[in-house]
């Protein structure tokens, strides 16, 4: 062997040895914390993530659920030299999510701030981890979610939901398969664009296809970017290019919409006190528009994707719950009858629909959880956790544990009935505390209007072969597109022709 090759081999062995020593030392602080065996020394638990069987409808949160059941309320997770801790006790959820002392962990939110080198959510309201900077934004944007502002949005909710139902009624022959995932996504996008930014996207009418495709590619890119090796794999180059182009396209859409609003303001036109108005105010005095575009992308994506998936999961589950559907139809008939416009007051009277939507979020939360940074060593549920550790809190995991919910895999809206005990710090689909979702009331009103109109006018049946599993594309969504055949309410098959 030549001296050069010998030297190179020695250098590689030395580097490998140093890497192993570094990984071992980094993990040694956590070895006392319960957790599953690592299938790989260097990769840690990463191979477990790859084997989660998304083809069968299992997602990463199902792996964490298995570990929480087996190892208790504090579970160690190793990936390379990094360690996170899954926490699943109500006491700890209350302690860490309800206090302003514990911030989001910036390392865990980098996957949203930039994706494959392109700025996506940046320092927007979801991904900003510095409390002071986040609070400055939140205080201004909160004004767009006042009660009076939300009530004024009922017109938009009704308009777009009515448009959806009319399109579906035209396909309601009991035979034509319809992707409810797609239709509900277009509806949520149209609602969000008009309510938040004063723009008409007309997704339901087949317009803006490049925009919907860009959103789809971007969401797939967020998930793909979690594989730290993805950017180095030759087979991923096309996807990386498409994801980057999609992100640039989305931010350009934001620039165009912002420019239109600024021009309207210059002309002295009256503009709504919507989200766009408030994020313009929040970024007054900024040197450039990048922070403003961060919040545009944040609200445009988070504001429609979670609602669309919530609706799709609900339709999927109701397709196998005829007794629950019958109760819902009876309530809708009593509260709104045949009228086409739902009033704000009607929403509060749809009690059982509220229960169904909450139960859907328990089993199928599109936003599965959140992270907090533990800065100092702390005793958590009797286990010493070192400082500078990311803590993971999952409403998906806790919502499916029989420790907190009896028969947790059964869809039972009565868990949220008026006389039922409230789940305390075991159910947080909109997070909790100061970092809870700013748009949760908006989302709850929106999905209630859409579901009420669907139940009022249509019956839906899942096409045979559709699976009830999940997949992850930044958020959790149904594994299949929720293909349904539709019929008008009260539809009866035509009688057979009389004999000749």
UniProtKB/Swiss-Prot annotation:
Its cofactor is heme. It is an enzyme of class 1 (oxidoreductase). The gene is CYP46A1. Heme binds at residue 437. It comes from the Eukaryota. This is Cholesterol 24-hydroxylase. PANTHER family: CHOLESTEROL 24-HYDROXYLASE, CYTOCHROME P450 FAMILY 46 SUBFAMILY A. InterPro entries: CYP46A1, Cyt_P450, Cyt_P450_CS, Cyt_P450_E_grp-I, Cyt_P450_sf. The chain crosses the membrane at residues 3-23. It catalyses: cholesterol + reduced [NADPH--hemoprotein reductase] + O2 = (24S)-hydroxycholesterol + oxidized [NADPH--hemoprotein reductase] + H2O + H(+); cholestanol + reduced [NADPH--hemoprotein reductase] + O2 = (24S)-hydroxycholestanol + oxidized [NADPH--hemoprotein reductase] + H2O + H(+); 7-dehydrocholesterol + reduced [NADPH--hemoprotein reductase] + O2 = cholesta-5,7-dien-3beta,24S-diol + oxidized [NADPH--hemoprotein reductase] + H2O + H(+); 7-dehydrocholesterol + reduced [NADPH--hemoprotein reductase] + O2 = cholesta-5,7-dien-3beta,25-diol + oxidized [NADPH--hemoprotein reductase] + H2O + H(+). It comes from Homo sapiens (Human). Belongs to the cytochrome P450 family.
């Amino acid at each position: 062997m030549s001296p050069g090759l010998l030297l190179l081999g020695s250098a590689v062995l030395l580097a490998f040895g140093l890497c192993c020593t570094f990984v071992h030392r980094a993990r040694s602080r956590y070895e006392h914390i319960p957790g599953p065996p690592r299938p790989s020394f260097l990769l840690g638990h990463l191979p477990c993530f790859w084997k989660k069987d998304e083809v069968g409808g299992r997602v990463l949160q199902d792996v964490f659920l298995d570990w929480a059941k087996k190892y208790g309320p504090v579970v160690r997770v190793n990936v390379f030299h990094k360690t996170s801790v899954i926490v699943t006790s109500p006491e700890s959820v209350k302690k860490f999510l309800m206090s302003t002392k514990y911030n989001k962990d910036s390392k865990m939110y980098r996957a949203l701030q930039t994706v494959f080198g392109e700025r996506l959510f940046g320092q927007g309201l979801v991904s900003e981890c510095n409390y002071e900077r986040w609070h400055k934004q939140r205080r201004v944007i909160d004004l767009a979610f006042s009660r009076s502002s939300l009530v004024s949005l009922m017109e938009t909710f009704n308009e777009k939901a009515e448009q959806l139902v009319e399109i579906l009624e035209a396909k309601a022959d009991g035979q034509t398969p319809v992707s409810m995932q797609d239709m509900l996504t277009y509806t949520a996008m149209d609602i969000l664009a008009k309510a938040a930014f004063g723009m008409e996207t007309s997704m339901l009418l087949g317009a803006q296809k490049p925009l919907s495709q860009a959103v789809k590619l971007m969401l797939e890119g967020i998930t793909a970017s979690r594989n730290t090796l993805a950017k180095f794999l030759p087979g991923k180059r096309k996807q990386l290019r498409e994801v980057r182009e999609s992100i640039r396209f989305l931010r350009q859409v934001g620039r165009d919409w912002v420019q239109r609003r600024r021009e309207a303001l210059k002309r002295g036109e009256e503009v709504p006190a919507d989200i766009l108005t408030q994020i313009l105010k929040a970024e007054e005095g900024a040197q450039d528009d990048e922070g403003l575009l961060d919040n545009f992308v944040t609200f445009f994506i988070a504001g429609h994707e979670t609602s669309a998936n919530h609706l799709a999961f609900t339709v999927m589950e109701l397709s196998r719950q005829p007794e629950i559907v019958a109760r819902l139809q009876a309530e809708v008939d009593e509260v709104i009858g045949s009228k086409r416009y739902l009033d704000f007051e009607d929403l509060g009277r749809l009690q059982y629909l509220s229960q169904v939507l909450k139960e859907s979020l328990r089993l199928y939360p599109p936003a599965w959880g959140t992270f907090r940074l533990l800065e100092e060593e702390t005793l958590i549920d009797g286990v010493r956790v070192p400082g500078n550790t990311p803590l993971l809190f999952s409403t998906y995991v806790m919502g499916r544990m029989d420790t907190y919910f009896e028969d947790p895999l059964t869809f039972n809206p009565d868990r949220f009935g008026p006389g039922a005990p409230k789940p305390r710090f075991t159910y947080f689909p909109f997070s909790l505390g100061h970092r809870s979702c700013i748009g949760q009331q908006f989302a709850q009103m929106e999905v209630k209007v859409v579901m009420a109109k669907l139940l009022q006018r249509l019956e839906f049946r899942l096409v045979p072969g559709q699976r009830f599993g999940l997949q992850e594309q930044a958020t959790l969504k149904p594994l299949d597109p929720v293909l349904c055949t539709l019929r008008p309410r009260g539809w009866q098959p035509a009688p057979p022709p009389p004999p000749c």
